[in-house]
């Protein structure tokens, strides 16, 4: 049987996917983007309310365009940003949605069930609340303003509030944000497009067919996507459908896949050839091999996302957030059911919808929360989900024609965002005060569960020893010998637990080895596979691990299926342990917990025996 290496799916930490579990550098980038968005929002508000407000209006109404023969095209600066540049924002959203449903967090349907249902409730209930304030008339058409959460501000708000152990709630909210974006995009496509022109629409459909075939081109796929995408934008614009949806359509048709061993090995060979004989031909070949080993979806996210985060979204905030906040405008907003409908929809509707749906699906047993994620954490995150900005202001511009009512709606969006932040901050602070978490890392965060954890010994043993380690760590290998002595000393009085904490920066094969051990565990061969991995921890290529699986007594066909085809079974099991370690601020392996408390000191058998004996009393 020919075996290919299953690609590591843990996050791609340097990529901009919002579900990435990546590094602190990635989170810093997210926070910087949110800060920049906030800065441009404040600048727009100050500018629109300054003595130079006329220059702000003049800038937005400035026409830009070009001529080609007898044809002339022009748009205002505001429409260039909202209709043209924002296409790239929706393009990135589409790429992320495609990736998450294909190879990301949403491939595990049971894991995604709770945030997906919560997101659906967070889309529907805010609209219902808004329509209770605006049941008819022109205002009712603006119900879409309250359905979306601004992901950039959501991430920034979590960074500012700094709730205890935020990793789980952050992942939950980012998963929810993906579904939230899908709902908003559908609303824009179906309900905020009118006066459809048939001929351009037919052209748009034909272009979509051509885009679907681009993946089969032997080369020049990038330029083909760009040219056909631009043509699709024009066709949708002429058809009367909001042209930014061209970005989503193109993104959904771009293939995404996990890196496979064969193209990666070809890239390594090309790099080795270039290292031995540097020349332009080898340089081009190496560059092309590296590029082809990663899906175009991933490459485009890496290339386009920084431009969207640091240029397009700040420009969008600048041209859309400049609402007049003088006395008459605020008075009109305070008396407007449009404003109050938006505030209530975003603040109350989002909170009740997300928190209520989470409670209900958990209570009925239709879904489960990830380890370490509590309902009170969900409540704080649900409140922050009322921060609506980017898509909310976007829909304000296309759903409302009257400038004065647009200002009332924008005031509602801004007020709701401030209130949602304050409510989220209060919930996190109050729950932390009423039920203060344990000091980070001093006590075991997640209790031992013999049904879930990998354990050796009696489940009701009076003494427990939990190890967070990785299979490439030489110290973990040495501790394994010491723990064998400790187990022999205590016999049935000791329950030993292994949990995964692969330190990928120091040990690049540790995560893959952990996945292999979990695939073996599905066949009841975890400890046998653990022995093989520690015995050969200097040789942890995937081809080696298949040999170790055979030596451990695994059915190799089933092992291959579990690590390649059904990889989410093992991926999330490893990630759960690693995220618990991250939540406890662990930073080294092995990390040991003796009777639930962090062990500080030597790892030799005698020291561990003394620590366990001290815990008997």
Swiss-Prot record:
Residues 434-617 form the Thioredoxin domain. This is Na(+)/H(+) antiporter NhaA 1. The lineage of its organism: Bacteria, Bacillati, Actinomycetota, Actinomycetes, Mycobacteriales. Na(+)/H(+) antiporter that extrudes sodium in exchange for external protons. Keywords: Antiport, Cell membrane, Ion transport, Membrane, Sodium, Sodium transport, Transmembrane, Transmembrane helix, Transport. It is found in: Cell membrane. It comes from Mycolicibacterium gilvum (strain PYR-GCK) (Mycobacterium gilvum (strain PYR-GCK)). Residues 1-433 are annotated as: Na(+)/H(+) antiporter NhaA. InterPro entries: Na/H_antiporter_dom_sf (IPR023171), NhaA (IPR004670), Thioredoxin-like_fold (IPR012336), Thioredoxin-like_sf (IPR036249), Thioredoxin_domain (IPR013766). In the N-terminal section; belongs to the NhaA Na(+)/H(+) (TC 2.A.33) antiporter family. Signal peptide: none annotated.
């Amino acid at each position: 049987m020919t075996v290919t290496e299953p690609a590591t799916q843990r996050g791609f930490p340097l990529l901009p996917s919002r579900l990435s579990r990546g590094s602190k550098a990635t989170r810093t980038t997210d926070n910087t983007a949110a800060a920049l968005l906030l800065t441009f929002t404040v600048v727009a508000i100050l500018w629109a309310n300054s003595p130079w407000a006329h220059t702000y209006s003049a800038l937005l109404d400035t026409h830009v365009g070009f001529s080609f023969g007898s044809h002339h095209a022009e748009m205002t600066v505001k429409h260039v940003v909202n209709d043209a540049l924002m296409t790239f924002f929706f393009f990135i959203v589409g790429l992320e949605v495609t990736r998450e449903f294909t190879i990301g967090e949403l491939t595990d349907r049971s894991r995604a069930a709770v945030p997906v249902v919560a997101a659906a409730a967070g889309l529907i209930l805010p609209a219902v609340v808004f329509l209770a304030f605006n049941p008819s008339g022109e205002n009712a058409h603006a119900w879409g303003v309250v359905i979306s959460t601004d992901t950039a501000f959501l991430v920034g708000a979590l960074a500012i509030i700094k709730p205890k152990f935020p990793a789980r709630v952050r992942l939950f909210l980012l998963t929810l944000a993906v579904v939230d974006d899908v709902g908003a995009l559908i609303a824009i496509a179906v309900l905020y497009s009118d006066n459809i022109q048939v001929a351009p629409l037919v052209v748009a459909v034909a272009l979509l067919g051509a885009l679907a075939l681009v993946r089969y081109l032997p080369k020049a796929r990038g330029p083909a996507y760009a040219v056909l995408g631009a043509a699709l934008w024009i066709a949708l614009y002429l058809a009367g459908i909001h042209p930014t949806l061209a970005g989503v359509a193109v993104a959904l048709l771009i293939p995404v896949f996990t890196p496979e061993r064969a193209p990666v090995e070809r890239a390594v060979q090309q790099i080795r050839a270039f290292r031995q004989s540097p020349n332009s031909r080898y340089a081009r070949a190496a560059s092309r091999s590296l590029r082809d080993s990663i899906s175009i979806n991933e490459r485009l996210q890496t290339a386009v996302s920084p431009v969207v985060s640091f240029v397009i979204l700040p420009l969008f905030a600048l041209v859309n957030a400049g609402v007049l906040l003088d006395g008459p405008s605020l008075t009109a907003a305070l008396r407007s059911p449009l404003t109050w409908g938006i505030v209530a929809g975003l603040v109350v509707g989002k909170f009740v919808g997300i928190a209520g749906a989470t409670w209900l699906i958990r209570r009925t047993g239709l879904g489960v929360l990830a380890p370490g994620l509590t309902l009170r954490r969900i409540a704080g995150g649900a409140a922050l989900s009322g921060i609506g900005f980017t898509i909310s202001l976007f829909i304000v511009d296309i759903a409302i024609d009257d400038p004065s009512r647009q200002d009332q709606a924008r005031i509602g969006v801004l007020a709701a965002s401030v209130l949602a932040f304050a409510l989220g901050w209060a919930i996190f602070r109050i729950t932390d005060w009423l039920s203060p978490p344990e000091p980070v890392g001093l006590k075991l965060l997640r209790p031992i569960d013999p049904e879930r954890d990998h354990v050796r010994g009696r489940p009701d043993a009076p003494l427990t020893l939990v190890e967070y380690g990785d299979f490439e760590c030489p110290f973990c290998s040495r501790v394994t010998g010491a723990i064998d002595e400790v187990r022999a000393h205590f016999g049935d009085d000791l329950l030993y637990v292994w949990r995964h904490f692969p330190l990928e920066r120091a040990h690049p094969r540790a995560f893959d080895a952990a996945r292999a051990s979990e695939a073996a565990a599905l066949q009841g061969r975890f400890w046998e596979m653990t022995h093989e991995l520690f015995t050969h921890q200097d040789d942890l290529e995937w081809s080696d691990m298949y040999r170790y699986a055979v030596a451990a007594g695994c059915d190799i066909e089933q092992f291959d299926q579990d690590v390649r085809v059904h990889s989410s079974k093992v991926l999330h099991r490893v990630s759960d342990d690693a995220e618990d370690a991250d939540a406890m601020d662990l930073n080294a392996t092995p990390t040991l917990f003796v009777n639930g408390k962090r062990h500080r000191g030597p790892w030799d058998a005698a020291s561990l025996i003394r620590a366990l004996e001290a815990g008997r009393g």
